[in-house]
Amino acid sequence: TIVVEAPVVKSSVSFLDANTNPVTLEELTTQCVVPTWANQELTIAHQDFISCVHDAASSFYAGETVNAPDIRCSHIVRGRTPQSLGKKASELLECEKTQFYQRLAFAFTIPTIYETVNGQKLELCVGGVRNYSDLNLYRSTKGLEKFSVFIGWRVRICSNQVLTGEAVSYTHLR
């Protein structure tokens, strides 16, 4: 039997499944508002953060397959348009409702960049985390915006046991 290993075109990045909702970039763009500081200056939108990291990885790893990001969000904040401030929540029309997610995590793989260690395939994985509550949006002026970005190797395992192992360190990328 000949086994030919081919890169997986779309490998999902399962992470943070508990207490989060899967969303798409399109949903973030069309269904969520961008929060503002107290002086009404916009923050950087979650979808802009994701697109920036994805575009940077695509540019840096030009010629490689860069999968679409898997996005998880939590802590939805619901609001309303200024025109509907006097209405009860039950009387709001859909066009008068607003929402955004306070917390965001995303990750995507680059399956054409991989290493094999002890028979396990490790794919390169890039992602980020953001939390609007770290920003203190009630400040009177715009403050620093915080973002967390990570890059590392992802290994797929299937086990129903507690796992331990030795760390692997590489000083070069393929």
Predicted regions located by residue number:
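TRNA-recognition modules of translation machinery and tRNA-sensing kinases, especially anticodon-binding
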Residues: V168
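Ser/Thr-rich, low-complexity intrinsically disordered terminal regions
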Residues: S58-Y114
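Feature for intrinsically disordered/low-complexity regulatory segments and propeptides
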Residues: T1-H54, S58-T65, P69-V77
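Broad, structure-driven detector of short, well-ordered beta-strand segments within folded domains
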Residues: F106, T116-L144
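Short, hydrophobic/proline-enriched secondary-structure or compact coil segments at domain edges
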Residues: K142-N160
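Conserved small/polar residues in nucleotide/adenosyl-binding loops
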Residues: T171-H172
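A general secondary-structure signal for short beta-strands and their flanking turns/coil
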Residues: H46, I50, Q99-R103, L144-F150
